Amino acid sequence: MDNALPEPEPLIALIEALRRLPGVGARSARRMAYHLLQHDVQGADMLGRALAGAVQNLRRCARCNSFTEDDVCVICANPKRDASLLCIVETPADQNVIESSHGYRGLYYVLMGRLAPLEGVGPRELDFQRVLDRAADGLVQEVILATNFTAEGETTAHFLGEALAERGLKVTRLARGVPAGSELEYVDAGTIAWALMERRAT
């Protein structure tokens, strides 16, 4: 017999919404919800407005697929960036880590994911054809594969590396200074800068 206190529908909806965040289970989501409603109503309102604003105002960059307010993001629109270098990453968070290392002045393409066949994520879901078309724009001379050093990231890098090499492009991979099994988002900027400088051909 379930003696748990019945929760109002709006509270249940908030908890379920918070559970969508990575690494957040039912218990953590419930704690977050109660904290916001009990101790930080202003913060809850700010969070709601910020989320709504982001969903409404952000779009995908027409060039690199990252988030932007305009058709083309500030990096792609910067004429001082090296258009001969294209760095492929899994997420905007990975892009941000590489950018903060100050060791890269080229352009990016953000996959917004990685190959994960067991989860139903294949080349079509990641629109690999768009990636290949972007790399074959006539300006790109080297493609740096900066996917994570996880099983899925390595599979993604291998698949893309072969397809790009078939098109005559130079393809390199971050050096192994980045620990195996790690995600770029959690690697320090110095290690990322070294891995970029010491990148190797695939």
Curated annotation (Swiss-Prot):
Transferase in keyword set: no
Domain Toprim intervals: 84-179
PROSITE patterns linked to this entry: RECR, TOPRIM
Stored Pfam families: RecR_C, RecR_HhH, RecR_ZnF, Toprim_4
GO BP terms: DNA recombination; DNA repair
Zinc finger (C4-type): 61-76
InterPro entries documented for this protein: DNA_Rcmb_RecR (IPR000093), Rcmb_RecR (IPR023627), Rcmb_RecR_Znf (IPR015967), TOPRIM_dom (IPR006171), TOPRIM_RecR (IPR034137)
GO molecular-function term, one example from the UniProt record: DNA binding
Keyword annotations from UniProtKB, A to Z: DNA damage, DNA recombination, DNA repair, Metal-binding, Zinc, Zinc-finger
Keyword hit for Zinc: yes
Coiled coil: none
Family designation: Belongs to the RecR family.
Its biological purpose: May play a role in DNA repair. It seems to be involved in an RecBC-independent recombinational process of DNA repair. It may act with RecF and RecO.
Protein name (Swiss-Prot/TrEMBL): Recombination protein RecR
Originating species: Bordetella avium (strain 197N)
